[in-house]
Amino acid sequence: MSAYLKNYEELLFDFPAPRVLRITMGDPERLTPVSGKMHAEMVTIWNDIDADEDISAVILTGGKKAFSAGGDFALVEKSMSDFHFRMQTWKETRSLVYNVINCNKPIISAIRGPAVGAGLVCGLLSDVSIASKNARIIDGHPRLGVAAGDVSAIIWPLHCG
């Protein structure tokens, strides 16, 4: 395993086949909420993968119950109450979109269960998105009183036609 992968704490890695990296977002036994730390890791991992000559393809997956549960409550609360943190998170989200799109390795997302938030962004921006019969694509913004309009709201209709 590439040494830099050990620097990531909230993303889990394994190689199901030679040169194929599988990324599991968070604890596979939980609903995979995205913490501030995981959000930051999701931004930087794509540049690391792109530069890694030992990786030819990526599979992105979540836990057994959910692909991604969206931002954890601490992340959401801090984003709502701390202007500077909110601006940092928005910048990270912009970088997340660019980094996934600019990664030259094929990315395949395996979406099972609910898919919300930053995990959903990565899933929908993947080169190939495979959704199970129980996959649910959810924009959680309206539930928080926030207008829908992140990249998920833009990219999903483009995928569906």
Regions found by a protein language model. Name each.
Residues 23, 60, 72, 122-123:
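Hydrophobic/aromatic residues within transmembrane alpha-helices
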Residues 1-63, 98:
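Conserved CoA-thioester-binding segment of acyl-CoA-metabolizing enzymes
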